[in-house]
Amino acid sequence: MQCPTCQNTDSRVLESRSADTGKSVRRRRECLNCSFRFTTYERVETMPISVLKKDGSRELFNKDKLVTGISRACEKTTFSREAIIDFVDSIESQIIQDSNKDIKSSQIGELILKGLRKENEVAYIRYASVYRKFNGVKDFVSTLESLKGSSKNELASIL
């Protein structure tokens, strides 16, 4: 590993520990030339995953896009930033386990909806309204019915 200050490639490991819930190894190193101490992380390299879009195009899987979309759905809820990142990490793990190299964007959307339904009902409704392109109140009502198992009369009295 190259020292960030003197560019020497000789260093010794002072300490190693598991990081990122076991997905990486954090190593504390010391340069043998200048004695500068620095930290490195070692992770398993994964194959890039292509997302097949509805229009037929492909793009590389981008975890940040999921964080952004889910963060919008979770605004003004009790879902913390850390919980969102943990949630996205779990979605990413499922994608890596379930797919070879390609996954449809619709599959990612359904994984997110399935997870949000368990985690936060408000975020689920918000995400579903964008993902499923709700056109009006009827779409919200039918989603609320499926979420709560309520009758139309009960929901109509609420609305």
UniProtKB/Swiss-Prot annotation:
GO biological process, one term: negative regulation of DNA-templated transcription
Superkingdom of origin organism: Bacteria
InterPro entries xref list: ATP-cone_dom, NrdR-like_N, RNR_NrdR-like
Keywords for the protein's UniProt record, in alphabetical order: ATP-binding, DNA-binding, Metal-binding, Nucleotide-binding, Repressor, Transcription, Transcription regulation, Zinc, Zinc-finger
Cofactor(s) for this UniProt protein: Zn(2+)
GO molecular function, one term: ATP binding
Cofactor annotation remark: Binds 1 zinc ion.
Disulphide-bonded residues: none
Ranges annotated as unnamed zinc finger: 3-34
Residue ranges occupied by any ATP-cone domain in the UniProt entry: 49-139
One family name in Pfam for this protein: ATP-cone
Function: Negatively regulates transcription of bacterial ribonucleotide reductase nrd genes and operons by binding to NrdR-boxes.
Family statement: Belongs to the NrdR family.
HAMAP family tied to this protein: NrdR
Protein name, per record: Transcriptional repressor NrdR
Organism per entry: Prochlorococcus marinus (strain MIT 9515)
The gene coding this protein: nrdR
